[in-house]
Swiss-Prot record:
Single GO BP term: translation
Organism listed in the record: Pyrococcus horikoshii (strain ATCC 700860 / DSM 12428 / JCM 9974 / NBRC 100139 / OT-3)
A GO CC term assigned to this protein in UniProt: small ribosomal subunit
GO MF assignments: structural constituent of ribosome; tRNA binding
Name by which UniProt lists this protein: Small ribosomal subunit protein uS10
Annotated keywords: Ribonucleoprotein, Ribosomal protein
Organism lineage: Archaea, Methanobacteriati, Methanobacteriota, Thermococci, Thermococcales
Transmembrane residue ranges: none
SMART domains xref list: Ribosomal_S10
Keyword Ribonucleoprotein set for record: yes
Pfam family, one: Ribosomal_S10
HAMAP family xref list: Ribosomal_uS10
General function of this protein: Involved in the binding of tRNA to the ribosomes.
InterPro entries per the UniProt record, alphabetical: Ribosomal_uS10, Ribosomal_uS10_CS, Ribosomal_uS10_dom, Ribosomal_uS10_dom_sf, Ribosomal_uS10_euk/arc
């Protein structure tokens, strides 16, 4: 049987966990085997900018950081389960990738 590998990514952990829990509930209802959600390493993007626009004065900096959280879910690619997964309402800050693996 084919598997579906679902990759979730978001800057908001709560909305990411909500979507992962919805997928878990669908798997339990339809009776398909599922592994995950497996937390992948969080990507931290750091940007340091100079506060002073003209270069004069003391060198003070602003530090900004963006964290991207990721989860990986493997699920059997049952037609009924996949249709329900496609109907999940996904928040704007969560991206989903679904890949079929044989």
């Amino acid at each position: 049987m084919q598997k579906a590998r679902i990759k979730l990514a978001s800057t908001n952990v709560r909305s990411l966990e909500e979507v992962a829990n919805q997928i878990r509930q669908i798997a339990e209802r339809t009776g398909v085997r599922m592994s995950g959600p497996i937390p992948l390493p969080t990507k931290r993007i750091r940007i340091v900018t100079r506060k002073s626009p003209d270069g004069e004065g003391s060198a003070t900096f602003d530090r900004w950081e963006l964290r991207i959280h990721k989860r990986l879910i493997d699920i059997e690619a049952d037609e009924r389960a996949m249709r329900q997964i496609m109907r999940i309402r996904v928040p704007e800050d969560v991206t989903i990738e679904i890949e079929l693996i044989s």
